[in-house]
Amino acid sequence: MWVRTVCFCFFSYLFAGEIGAAIPADFIFHDKPVDALCFFNMEGNEIDLNQCGLAKENYVMKGQNSKLIAEGFIGYNWQDPEFSDSAQGYSYYKFFNAGEKLYWLYTLNSGGGTGVFTAIHLVKRKKADILNLETLAGGDRCNGGLQNVSESNHHLIFSQNLTAYDLIALSKEPDPRVKAYDDLAACAICCVAKAYYKVDSNAQLKFDYVDLGTIADTKEMPNQGALQSCFNQLFISYIAAGNSKLTQNTLNEFAAKFKQTCTKLN
């Protein structure tokens, strides 16, 4: 009991003053910012703020990531005291005003393992102790993990990590014969590109483009899957030709070339 009480007071102290004054009332609960753990392992589209957070989980606070705090995130690192030798987890969020009492919420969570779970939600305060929440996008590292989140002209802009399988799946006519893992890399550490999106306050998600990056050698790419080697050669050829930014049309062309060149090898 003493440990939990001290940590809770420490938590309150860290979020008092300047940070509390900077966030909207919709993210204040019991005179403190909404607990970041409320946005981890959620079920349904409502959050009861009385039934979530550090105290409800019986976790202890283990400090903060100063870099994330400096970037405007709210949250902390935590640990389950029943497993004091285990790695620490963390929960952070950053809000963006979507207008009309709506907010885009970018969340970062880890349970202490290798997973890094990121998501974007559209959030509204329904009652004093209830948040409504709609998840717009999310994933774990290369399996749909989110980065580069910012607000511009009343839209939220972000990137989503893609595996080779995800990249082909984004095209208008992906080959249904191509299977994740068996044919193309789809693991959580198999990133090859980023897809960029825009979203408005009506939760309309719009694909913008894919950035293939600057990889110059197939040795730097994943090798999981029977068709991955052929995919890698096609991928590198696009970058070498200066075609690293793919709109929907050029992405469709890439997928068509992959189908023509690589799937016949299977």
How would you name each of these model-derived features?
Residues 15-18, 42, 51, 61, ...:
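Intrinsically disordered, low-complexity segments enriched in small/polar residues
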Residues 5-14:
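Bacterial N-terminal signal peptides
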Residues 19-55, 145-266:
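Acidic, small-residue rich beta-repeat scaffolds with periodic aromatic anchors
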Residues 13, 59, 76, 90-93, ...:
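Sequence-level detector for tyrosine residue identity
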